[in-house]
Amino acid sequence: MSKETLILLYGGRSAEREVSVLSAESVMRAVNYSRFIVKTYFITKGGEFIKTQEFTDRPAEEEKLLTNDLAESYPKISPAAIYEKDAVVFPVLHGPMGEDGSIQGFLEILRLAYVGPNILSASSTMDKLLAKHVFEAVGVPQVPYVAAFADENQVEIAQEVVEKLDFPVFVKPANMGSSVGISKVDDLADLQPALSEAYKYDNRVVIEQGVDAREIECAVLGNNSDVSATLPGEVVKDVGFYDYNSKYIDNKIQMDIPAKVSADLAQKIQEYAKKAYKAVNGAGLSRCDFFVTKDGNVYLNEVNAIPGFTQWSMYPLLWENMGLSYSDLIEKLVDLAKETFETRENHLL
């Protein structure tokens, strides 16, 4: 029986390309090579596509995916040249142009099956302001927030923050993930510098109420009504703020899997996770991040439609705790991608 082709897209145009490379390298090592051939394509910061490597067997531990200058010495190809009949694409891409619906729309035009969120679920979860409206509509609790726009009066925005929120607050670009561009603000004097930093990444910003809470995460897997959620895990920080470097570069975090929570609280988190996932028409996978306060209040922080897939990432570790290995998880995601593709094609008839 001939092997199936799994195409890995990695790199990308966003500030989160480092995470993408780390995730893609983990995937290429964990793939079941008795079933798949893996073909890799690097997307440069400028948006060019470069065919890099091809693996028919598990690569050596020291082998790395080509990136940046090394990859750019390879010939650039037309983006459409990644097409291969019956191949499945795993877009291991984070942030804008990766999990905002852009690459998903491109792959649908090519009529390729792909792992993860569709156009709607990608774009709606990537946009923090839109996501907040959706989750509010289905009754999933969230922390209070203020919306800010770069072209509005910044003094009036500051006044609204003072009236509606208490410090500390967190200032977040509406369309960015992995803590990129996010600042913790302890007083009014630091608000404008934090807004200026966030506006570098998006002209729409969310200012959220800070809460003294545990950070609890739940992994979701499935399509349509057949959706499963894991027991939750907890992010245990030894840094003051769980920023981009502490998440992915310095690895200054630890995780408790499963989280030390009551059965009732775990069930509530799982139900909120599945409700939020279905509300945005989730497909394939998502990681739902929650705050849990000392008095037991649960707030949804965000739904991450393409969560980190590195060897120390919460999403695969949560499923491993449920008995689903990393390699089997990848196969399940490929099968879900093919199922979604068939459904989409049938709806076009």
UniProtKB/Swiss-Prot annotation:
ATP binds at residues 162-217. Mg(2+) 2 binds at residues 302, 304. Mg(2+) 1 binds at residues 289, 302. Keywords: ATP-binding, Cell shape, Cell wall biogenesis/degradation, Cytoplasm, Ligase, Magnesium, Manganese, Metal-binding, Nucleotide-binding, Peptidoglycan synthesis. Its cofactor is Mg(2+); Mn(2+). GO terms for molecular function: ATP binding; D-alanine-D-alanine ligase activity; metal ion binding. The keyword Cytoplasm applies. Its EC number is 6.3.2.4. GO terms for biological process: cell wall organization; peptidoglycan biosynthetic process; regulation of cell shape. Binds 2 magnesium or manganese ions per subunit. It is an enzyme of class 6 (ligase). It comes from the Bacteria. Residues 132-335 form the ATP-grasp domain. It is found in: Cytoplasm. InterPro entries: ATP-grasp, ATP_grasp_subdomain_1, D-Ala_lig_Van_CS, D_ala_D_ala, Dala_Dala_lig_C, Dala_Dala_lig_N, PreATP-grasp_dom_sf. It holds the Pfam family Dala_Dala_lig_C. GO terms for cellular component: cytosol. It catalyses: 2 D-alanine + ATP = D-alanyl-D-alanine + ADP + phosphate + H(+). Pathway: Cell wall biogenesis; peptidoglycan biosynthesis. The keyword Manganese applies. Belongs to the D-alanine--D-alanine ligase family. Cell wall formation. This is D-alanine--D-alanine ligase. The gene is ddl.
